[in-house]
Amino acid sequence: MIAATYTKKPGALSRAVACCALLLALVLLAACERSPPGASEVPVALLHPPLTPLFVDLEERTFRYFWDTSDRPNALVPDRFPYNEPFSSIAAVGFGLTAYAIGVERGWITRQQARDRSLTTLRFFATAPQGPEPSGKAGHNGFFYHFLQLDSGTRYASWVEVSSVDTALLLAGVLFAQTYYDRDDPAEAEIRILADAIYARVDWPWLQVRKPLIGMGWLPESGFIPHDWQGYNEAMLVYILALGSPTHPIGDDAWVAWTRNYDHAWGQFQQQEYLGFGPLFGHQYSHVWIDFRGIRDDYMRRRGLDYFENSRRATIAQRNYAIANPMRWKGYGENVWGLTASDGPLAASLDYDGQSREFRHYSARGAGIADVFDDGTIAPTAAVASLPFAPEIVMPAVEEMQHRYGDEIYGKYGFLDAFNPSFDYDMPLKTGRIVPELGWVASDYIGIDQGPIVAMIANYRDGFVWDVMRRNPYIRRGLLRAGFQGGWLEEGPQPRKGARP
């Protein structure tokens, strides 16, 4: 187990690496700030300063969240920790399946340990009871409930829905495990078979109530949720997986319908022109597993960029928004920024700076072309998970947040979920605590915020998760059916790079 306090290690080499990284970051940052509206002019290929010791430490701590908390008979990952509500997030399980292999490649656990934990996970989901009954089931028609009881693995409560997007995040981890564990070994062969069965069972057309769009979910008490996934957001992964299905695929017209309203979200915000979605998780989740560099669908071909560059611009725009700080929140600046879905202090309207301001507990927060909700709450995952897109602004931000707030926000499993320097009111809180001179700080780590941290650091280092998923035939098929062309899709499946035993 790693220590609870991060300390920079002395030595000429570490100082030299850190100095080089900082120098490069400053040069690239200056170039970034000179970018004309609608462009981020620094070539992405140049933006690769080496990881500093903090990122190495953060990657391991965040991996440990998944490894430590899933050590149970069904290997389910809790939605959050140490909050004592006993439920698992199926999306967090998908991130966990990805994190275990990262732990192998980094030398923190053995391949056998990761294989066995992954096999336990897949055995559970392959055999978990499904059906329309309101209790005692883990899902229906191949989809799974958003939250499951940690012990029984069945639906957590009557308000929990069968979720298309959370099932997709779980499946991304399942397919990652299927592709990573590729050896001639009985246990690894079983992982591949179980992954196929879990993915093939999902009846995607069942949730196409208003075809060709895919609905958000279903509840046994009230039926289908009256909302569909359309326009740019985190559900890009849902459509790619549904198009790639070998058993229950959706039609090609679904991607056309999904992108039909993109123009409403396209525009300029904070000196960047891009396809907007306020919270940064919408620009990150699908990118955890899919390498969008150099591949484009029809819409992005017409716009002249790819989704990776789009996420880069969204990241830069969020930082620019924090520098502008139109709502005058405390702490915001060039190296303290990041709005996404996260915990917050509480749900209330309170006086701040002579104005009534809305604060929220857990909520999506963001700033973009069409939507802004900002209550002063910063989530470190928002910046860290954008590391591959814009390292020249992410690295200084992560270093500054850890340096400025230290152990109050950085602990056993890395960054606590969020903090709000502006919220220092003396009142009862649902979660978190008030720290003098700092403000509100979350008390929990949240699985779906931890997952992008560990995965995107790995992708930044050497493209590990992306390289594995490039070899998955279902991902490739889904992208091709969505009309993606170019880049690695034109190269054909690549052989696997060397791996640890």
Where are these predicted regions, by residue range?
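N-terminal secretory signal peptides that target proteins for export/translocation
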Residues: 1-13
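Composition-driven detection of intrinsically disordered, low-complexity segments
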Residues: 13-14, 225
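Sec-dependent N-terminal signal peptides
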Residues: 14-24
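C-terminal motif of bacterial Sec signal peptides marking the signal peptidase cleavage site
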Residues: 28-31
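Bacterial signal peptide processing site
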Residues: 33-35
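Ser/Thr/Asn(+Pro)-rich, low-complexity disordered segments
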Residues: 41-501
